[in-house]
């Protein structure tokens, strides 16, 4: 199946059932909806980490560096042994950084799609 055929297969139900008038309208609607759901997904992930650690990403990164250097602790991980705290903190830091990166990227996509629709 060619790319064009794949696009037709995806958008045809939107046209047949009168949800959209053109392929471009259907593709735009799908793209905007998907981007918005991704923004929500990553915003929720970022909010989760902020809630758990009660701090910003930059401050958490500083806390993780201090923890790894045996100069600090992270209250949210106090229930764990020191080695487990380090592993969990490093894992969460990596996930949090990725969530922030993808949130920014999806927000940019969402803005671009909104601007394109307004043009």
Place the predicted regions along the sequence by residue.
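Extended, charge-rich alpha-helical interface modules
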Residues: 2-119
């Amino acid at each position: 199946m060619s790319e064009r055929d794949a696009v037709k297969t995806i958008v045809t139900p939107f046209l047949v059932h009168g949800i959209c008038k053109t392929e471009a309208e259907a593709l735009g609607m799908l793209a905007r909806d998907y981007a918005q759901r991704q923004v929500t997904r990553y915003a929720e992930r970022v909010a989760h980490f902020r809630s758990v650690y009660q701090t910003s990403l930059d401050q958490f990164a500083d806390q993780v560096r201090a923890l790894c250097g045996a100069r600090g602790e992270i209250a949210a991980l106090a229930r764990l042994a020191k080695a487990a705290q380090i592993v969990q903190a490093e894992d969460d830091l990596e996930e949090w950084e990725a969530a922030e990166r993808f949130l920014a990227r999806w927000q940019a996509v969402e803005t671009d799609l909104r601007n394109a629709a307004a043009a």
